[in-house]
Amino acid sequence: MADSGNWEGRCSGWFNVEAIVERKTGDAIPADENYDGDDTEDSEMGDFIDNAHISNIYSQQEIAQALYHSQQVNADNEAIRVLKRKFAGSAGSSPDSKRHELKHKQRSPHILTIRDTNTTSTHLLCEEQDSGYGNTEVETYERQVPGPGGCLQSTSSSNNGSQMASPGETNSGSSSISNMDIDMESTPITDITNILKSSNVKATLLAKFKEVYGLSYMELVRPYKSDKTQCQDWVCAVFGVAPSLAESLKSLLTQYCLYIHLQCLTCSWGIIVLLLARFKCNKNRLTVQKLLHGLLNVTQEYMLIEPPRLRSTPCALYWYRTSLSNISETVGEVPEWIKRQTVVQHSLEDCQFDLSQMVQWAFDNDITNDCEIAYKYALLASEDSNAAAFLKSNAQAKYVKDCGTMCRHYKAAERKQMTMSQWITHRCDLIDDGGNWKHIVQFLRYQQVEFVPFLIALKQFLKGIPKQNCIVIYGPPDTGKSHFGMSLMQFMQGVVISYVNSNSHFWLSPLADAKMALLDDATPACWTYIDRYLRNALDGNPMCLDRKHKHLLQIKCPPLLITSNTNPKADDTWKYLHSRMKVFTFSNPFPFDSNGNPLYQLTNENWKAFFTKTWSKLDLTEDDDKENDGDTVQTFKCVSGRNPRTV
């Protein structure tokens, strides 16, 4: 320290510093006092004081607090993780719901196994009545854990993951984690039983259904493997339905169903609902599950949904007899598959399959393809008893093949016995009115084709006069040649032959049963083939036709229309064909409107109007007594008359 002499010289300064230290904060400093904020000497005196150990103490305390805080955070996170793992599959909103489940064990023990993870379904059967005070912030529950020596001890836990520690316990993070893991050391017997029961939920539900209803659920249904397969009728068994919802289910389903058959029986699980429903439209299993889940508040895992057995008489009798008893409620008209197997009149209508009825149906509807016959006739099973008998038969493929063969034979014979005038009249009767014949005439004029010469050629063409039996339409591409020819073939129901099949001996076999034919896009190679082998066909004289697996057939070639980009009369190579055909030239591109539609509509209705308008010009015969005597062609009938069956 400084000597005493120096201190005596600065005696007043010493007191000033001491006065400043004792003055209260905020007091004004007199102006006559000399105060310097940077007291260098005082700072020099401070260097004599060693305060390093005080800083070390403070830093150690801060490190300890940070370590303690991190340990507490880790312990809290671990406690929350354990609680989440324990209560992840709980159906209640808090651990207190376990006490409610044990309380209602006798009424619905399935709640111990059924865990609904949907948080929105909070109004289940075991919901506790609200006391009016609301739920407490911290909900605790007691559970028994094995203590030392195998004794059971009661522990308390809260929903925030904290443990109630004893006075002797410490607050370290490791002890908290060990306390939270105690619940994993024991597995009650009831949990093991629930796991065994829930390992096959469907088997458990089927066993309970058979115990309650006295019959197997699978005896009433035919299982669908896919959840996307659609059906109109469904048999649903729903487990654990609330009584109030079970009573109102019939009224809730009325807006979705045409027929409802509802049964409700009570067991130890609650109410089991058995439902036979015919919906207004086809639905798949997933759609029905979502509908019932929304109406009954039952998870989809505890529903059995399958379509019913439609051809089982015992199943039909079960639904019919239970509908008459007081254990079921029905709404709507009974499905026809139940009536057919239970009502006397419907039973009498079941008969053996008659092939003649199937052939008559195919002939009347002009169906000759085997695939169309099989599909469309099967659709009539719900309306036609013979179609239902067809579906029950084990020889459906044979019946379809025989029906198609006979129908084609009958159609071919019908065409052969008709003249060209009768055939055109027959085709016109099948087409609606309302056509405009001017479209065809205007299109011919647009292509610079004289209408009168074309009409004369068409008259001779339809009559099949020798040397006038073939019409050729020649022109550049995209002039509407094929469109004109195809529209005429569609109206006349003619056939189309293709030169691409000329390597086969049977490529001309469609001409055997045709009233008119079209050879589209004849190339020079095709004209060479016609010049070599088909001169008689163009003449309209009889020719010999080879058919597959059949003897040779002698026929007169039907009127043949040919379209080509090559003019056969311009080449002397085919000079022998010049006198056998009538050539018309289409020189202008086919016209379209601004929307891309054809400007001239060559439809069946317009062709009907064209033939009706030019009937006399084409020299087609007309039946004068048609109104009095009816059609000259007899109506085909292959089904013999029979007396109605009476009871």
Curated annotation (Swiss-Prot):
Q: Where in the cell is it found?
A: Host nucleus
Per the entry, what this protein does is: ATP-dependent DNA 3'-5' helicase required for initiation of viral DNA replication. It forms a complex with the viral E2 protein. The E1-E2 complex binds to the replication origin which contains binding sites for both proteins. During the initial step, a dimer of E1 interacts with a dimer of protein E2 leading to a complex that binds the viral origin of replication with high specificity. Then, a second dimer of E1 displaces the E2 dimer in an ATP-dependent manner to form the E1 tetramer.
Post-translational modification remark: Phosphorylated.
Question: What's its catalytic activity?
Answer: Couples ATP hydrolysis with the unwinding of duplex DNA by translocating in the 3'-5' direction; ATP + H2O = ADP + phosphate + H(+)
Organism classification, top ranks? Viruses, Monodnaviria, Shotokuvirae, Cossaviricota, Papovaviricetes
**Region of interest called DNA-binding region, as start-end residue ranges on this chain:** 184-350
Q: Where is the composition biased (Polar residues)?
A: 152-179, 631-647
InterPro entries the UniProt entry points to: Helicase_SF3_DNA-vir, P-loop_NTPase, PPV_DNA_helicase_E1_C, PPV_DNA_helicase_E1_N, PPV_E1_DBD, PPV_E1_DBD_sf, Rep_E1_papillomaV, Znf_lg_T-Ag_D1_dom_sf
For molecular function, the Gene Ontology terms on record are: ATP binding; ATP hydrolysis activity; DNA binding; DNA helicase activity
- Under which EC number(s) is this enzyme classified? 5.6.2.4
Where along this sequence does the record place binding of ATP?
475-482
Query: What stretch or stretches form a coiled coil here?
Result: none
Q: Give the SF3 helicase domain ranges.
A: 449-599
Q: Which residues does the record list as Phosphoserine (modified residue)?
A: 90, 94, 108, 121
This chain's protein is named Replication protein E1
Pfam families listed in its UniProt record = PPV_E1_C, PPV_E1_DBD, PPV_E1_N
**At what sequence positions does the UniProt record place the cross-link Glycyl lysine isopeptide (Lys-Gly) (interchain with G-Cter in SUMO)?**
556
Would you kindly state one Gene Ontology biological process term found in this protein's UniProt entry? DNA replication
Establish whether keyword Cell membrane is in the entry: no
Assembly description: Can form hexamers. Interacts with E2 protein; this interaction increases E1 DNA binding specificity. Interacts with host DNA polymerase subunit POLA2. Interacts with host single stranded DNA-binding protein RPA1. Interacts with host TOP1; this interaction stimulates the enzymatic activity of TOP1.
Q: Which UniProt keywords apply?
A: ATP-binding, DNA replication, DNA-binding, Early protein, Helicase, Host nucleus, Hydrolase, Isomerase, Isopeptide bond, Nucleotide-binding, Phosphoprotein, Ubl conjugation
Could you say which protein family the record assigns here?
Belongs to the papillomaviridae E1 protein family.
> What species is this protein from?
Human papillomavirus type 34
Q: Where is this motif: Nuclear localization signal?
A: 84-86
| Cellular-component GO terms for this entry | host cell nucleus
Region annotation Disordered: where it falls in the sequence? 89-116, 141-180, 622-647
